[in-house]
């Protein structure tokens, strides 16, 4: 059987960077990793309406820097920065009290070409009982207008309320998953419908990049 590797992890340090950047001793590593998970879960649950694309976490000795890429920065920042202050207060309950918290909010330039937001759009449409073929077609058309070079969408589960679960996918353009220099964006989402959960997977091909693997002098 064919084995599938995660498209983003497969391209780390080639076209993708790590979403968490820090170093910890073996003693503190589990605690730091648990903090990262809690931070990401907080953003996922409490900022779900902000159109979050990705969250990057950078740590220094006494500072945690959170970079949030979003399509709606106003929801996160709030009036006069009140939203940022609320997030910081909530995060202080999660992370080490001695660490300073810094939050940067980056607005996405091309919303319709982002795999996370495309998957989120399809999931929302499915939850509104829109037929899966119509939802995927709308998402693909929006991505094509955003000038992506290729897109693939897969929806799995009891499609349109069918008795037997199945998977269906649609692809437009090129999506070269075996080419390491290909700039592939990938995301998964779940849609809660009256017939159960539907899984949504989205691959977006944004062209090829020249690999920039860092050289390490020995």
Curated annotation (Swiss-Prot):
GO molecular function: rRNA binding; structural constituent of ribosome
Any one Pfam family match given in the protein's UniProt record, by short name: Ribosomal_S3_C
Keywords: Chloroplast, Plastid, Ribonucleoprotein, Ribosomal protein, RNA-binding, rRNA-binding
Domain KH type-2: 39-109
Primary location group: plastid
Family from the record: Belongs to the universal ribosomal protein uS3 family.
Record's subunit section: Part of the 30S ribosomal subunit.
Name the record gives this protein: Small ribosomal subunit protein uS3c
Annotated organism of origin: Rhodomonas salina
